[in-house]
Regions:
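Conserved acetyl-CoA-binding loop-helix of GNAT-fold acetyltransferases
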Residues: 78-96, 244-247, 253-266, 293
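Conserved hydrophobic beta-strand within the GNAT/NAT acetyltransferase core sheet
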Residues: 107-109, 242, 276-280
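Acyl-donor-binding surface of acyltransferase catalytic domains
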Residues: 75-150, 300-308
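Short amphipathic alpha-helix that is part of the acyltransferase structural core
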Residues: 1-30, 147-188
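Conserved donor-binding loop and adjoining core beta-sheet/short helix segment
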Residues: 28-89, 216-238
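Conserved active-site alpha-helix within GNAT-family acetyltransferase domains
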Residues: 113-129, 258, 270-271, 281-300
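A short helix-loop-beta-strand connector motif used in the catalytic cores of GNAT acetyltransferases and
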Residues: 28-45, 193-207, 224, 241, ...
Length: 312
């Protein structure tokens, strides 16, 4: 499988489809690179774009305020060399754009987690793996963890708004240590607005864990009709998105998170969800082992340079 010099983006995409299918059965069919800015080099092509968060939006808590994104498709056989050429071309493209040197910017490259052939090129260009998109297929059971007496999992409702926001902010503050998440002055207000809408809606897929009457954990997820934004990242359908899970520090290690995950997984499986996706921070020492025990494994890795101009 090879790409000739001068071969167009559609030819690259066709070859990448074959390559991705051999790497990971959960990867999607690569999308056609049509519309917007498309970069091509021998052996690779990519769509590149730019996202800017709206003031007051909760999206600003999940990363830099301005994100320059490259979505590469590399066919081979020299994946490292082709990706190196593509990243060099993108760096030159970014140099011509305003604002890439501002502090609150990031250059972001999503890359299949199992495609280790590209890792060296990403590192050589100053990109680091910050966030993981992990996947669980329907029916995969998590590791059973005794939760002890007095633990109750129940659906959350509008009266639980304060508890949900408090636990959500604990998660934002904790994850801010690891490079992707940013607690901003208006993050709590933005979270409150979003959660209020969620809890007021039908079947909000939001659960609280209580022990002896005190709230100690939270999980909320997006149903397939809400998760269309992330569904293209995997082949099976329908897709749900586990948006947030939090356990109070004093309650960790006692099976609270596993109990919440089990309740969610039962609901998702009953609803016919084929794959649940979630994000976790690569450097969070708790996330990778926990989510692996719950039946998740890495599907995509977001590689970043901050600010965007720091990319080499």
């Amino acid at each position: 499988m090879s790409v000739r010099a001068g071969q167009d983006a559609s030819a690259v995409t066709a070859l990448v489809a074959e390559r991705w299918a051999g790497l990971d059965r959960l990867l999607p069919v690569p999308p056609a690179l049509a519309g917007g800015d498309v970069l091509t080099v021998p052996g690779a092509a990519a769509r590149c774009g730019h996202w800017a968060g709206e003031p007051g939006s909760l999206d600003l808590a999940w990363g830099a305020a301005r994100r320059f994104r490259l979505e590469p498709q590399v066919a081979g056989p020299d994946v490292r060399g082709a990706l190196d050429r593509l990243l060099t071309r993108w760096r030159e493209h970014l140099a011509g754009l305003p604002g890439t040197g501002e502090d609150d910017t990031a250059a972001v490259v999503p890359w299949p987690s199992r495609d280790i052939a590209g890792h060296r090129a990403l590192l050589d260009h100053g990109l680091i793996p910050l966030a993981i998109i992990a996947a669980r297929t329907a029916g995969r059971d998590g590791q059973a963890v005794p939760s002890g007496p007095g633990l109750r999992i129940r659906p959350a409702g509008p009266a639980d708004l304060d508890s949900v926001v408090a636990l959500g902010m604990e998660t934002i503050r904790y994850d801010a240590h690891f490079g992707t998440v940013i607690e901003r002055p208006d993050s709590a207000a933005a979270l409150r607005r979003e959660v209020a809408v969620r809890l007021a809606g039908p079947a909000p897929w939001t659960w609280l864990a209580e022990r002896d009457g005190s709230v100690v954990g939270l999980l909320y997820a997006q149903r397939p009709d809400q998760a269309g934004w992330i569904a293209p990242l995997t082949r099976p359908a329908p897709v749900a998105y586990l948006e947030l899970m939090a356990v109070r520090p004093g309650a960790r290690g006692a099976g609270v998170g596993a109990a919440l995950a089990a309740v969610y997984h039962a609901a998702a499986d009953a609803a016919g969800v084929a794959v649940t996706l979630l994000h976790y921070e690569q450097m969070n020492p708790l996330s990778a082992p926990f989510w692996s025990q719950q039946g998740y494994r890495p599907l995509w890795t977001d590689w970043e340079a901050r600010p965007a101009a720091a990319m080499r």
